[in-house]
Amino acid sequence: MADPAVGAPAGMLIELTHRCPLHCPYCSNPLELVRREAELTCEQWTDILTQARELGVVQMHFSGGEPLARPDLPDLVGHARRLGAYVNLVTSGVGLTAERAHDLARRGVDHVQLSLQDADPAAGQAIAGARVHTAKLEAARAVTAAGLPLTVNIVLHRGNIDRTGRMVDLAVDLGADRIELANTQYYGWGLRNRAALMPTAAQLAAAREAVRHARTRYAGGPELVYVAADYYDDRPKPCMDGWGSTQLTVTPAGDVLPCPAAYAITTLPVENALRRPLSEIWYASRSFNAYRGTGWMREPCRTCPERHADHGGCRCQAFQLTGDAAATDPACGLSPHRSLVDAALAEVTDGPVPAFVPRGPVPA
């Protein structure tokens, strides 16, 4: 049953494809990727974008995988612009030439988020699994030359976190208007590589100090956002600002999710935009209503004074670690399952770091 208190979604993450030129070990896409032949057609995506705008979506985030792998990306961007949506492109930058950047700006892209693996070219390419560092720098310059605002997204992990300050410096040099430093979120392939990616407490402390210095050094410059490592905190992150409250995700095959990692919760039914209207999925589906509000909560969340701020933490993380999506997020110090997180932290030492398993390509 639909909750009459639920408002319209503000944003939609549009995962056009799982195909990607990179092989990052912290990839948050599902372990089982959507094959090219199972991807939605341009016509199907056009209909979904139209439905989303009618539903109330005002921000459309084109992502993947790598959205530039879709030759119909410019047409879909143009359709989103004609619908009146704010268009954001989330990209690795591989293949984003000056010509393509100008064309996408002309078609309707309002903003670009570009991933950067490291300030050190060799280290960054080792994580990306491809020789792409120079291409990324050229893509960043193409974005700013096209007159588009640029956000540089940097995922922090054990292998690059000691260069936090250098990565901020590089992003500033590239003309970034916004820099997001996000500690690795352990979903999908990232959870598989957790032991190799988890930084030490000392590394995190040094990174926070580097961010503090950068904010002082670049005061009045680009916005600098730091996303904390929730495993080391005693309170969970307010994931998605609440389940099914402001955002939805559509996968390459048309599955509609309350958050990008909700594929991990195998106990929930999977809704698909080819089988049910987007408005019905948002307002009336069991998957979207399962963890809205606070009625689903158990103790200690049910009576916690922070329940309206942190929403009980991340449902996907709770399921992946406990097998119960309604459990208190184990990252919370009050969770009866906090020992699961503490055990993972206990494995992080100053000794040898296990090798990570690179993300494989979409099967042919």
From Swiss-Prot:
Enzyme category, top tier: oxidoreductase
PROSITE patterns for this protein: RADICAL_SAM (PS51918)
GO biological process: pyrroloquinoline quinone biosynthetic process
InterPro entries in UniProt: 4Fe4S-binding_SPASM_dom, Aldolase_TIM, Elp3/MiaA/NifB-like_rSAM, PQQ_synth_PqqE_bac, PqqE-like, Radical_SAM_PqqE_MftC-like, rSAM
Pfam families for the chain: Radical_SAM (PF04055), SPASM (PF13186)
Keywords for this protein: 4Fe-4S, Iron, Iron-sulfur, Metal-binding, Oxidoreductase, Plasmid, PQQ biosynthesis, S-adenosyl-L-methionine
Record keyword 4Fe-4S present: yes
Binding of [4Fe-4S] cluster, residues: C20, C24, C27
Biological role: Catalyzes the cross-linking of a glutamate residue and a tyrosine residue in the PqqA protein as part of the biosynthesis of pyrroloquinoline quinone (PQQ).
Protein family according to the UniProt entry: Belongs to the radical SAM superfamily. PqqE family.
Protein's name in the database: PqqA peptide cyclase
Source organism (scientific name): Streptomyces rochei (Streptomyces parvullus)
Lineage per the UniProt record: Bacteria, Bacillati, Actinomycetota, Actinomycetes, Kitasatosporales
